[in-house]
Amino acid sequence: LARCDFNPVEQAPAELKQGDFRDLAQVITALELGVCSAALKKALLEKAQTQKAPVLGVTGTGGSGKSSLTDELVRRFRLDQDERLKIAILAVDPSRRKTGGALLGDRIRMNAIHGDKVFMRSFATRASGAEIAACLPEAIAAARAAGFDLVIVETSGIGQGDAAIVPLVDVPMYVMTPEFGAASQLEKIDMLDFADFVA
């Protein structure tokens, strides 16, 4: 167990090469661990601003089918675009407050992510206190800077008053189940005011 406790990134890459999944993974890990240099962060943000890749945010209650929907969207994008579209998926799962652990299980539901044009990265919320990881804004910038055509961000399950994904994405999507309770409950769901799509 002691041997498992090590820093996977001793030093962040000095730059991010477009199309290099390993570089992107290392940069995101460095961002997550807080060991990314200020110069690289600045370069990522500047590069991301020159890219036109849209960012789709998929959010909703736990168990509503966010991962299954994300997988289906990726499958259809791949088929529709004849595998030309480069897609990055950034998926967030909740950390358990008592143990600090997280089951990064979004990928269990995803079958269409295997291919050389699809990058998938799991995150834990850690101590962010929200449905997103603290490093997510910078990770989105890194994915855009890496030259992807589409970035899909999936949050962990949310409650009625949560909408942290909205300022980070271009197109927010809310996924819900038909068992939401009385009709008056719909008036309490903050994401319904912001979502461009409801599934």
Task: Describe each PLM feature range.
Residues 1-55:
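Extreme N-terminal, non-catalytic leader segments
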Residues 17-20, 113, 165, 188:
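Generic alpha-helical segment signature
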Residues 13, 123-125, 199:
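Short hinge/gating elements
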Residues 155-159, 168-185, 192-199:
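Conserved Switch II/interswitch segment of TRAFAC-class P-loop GTPases
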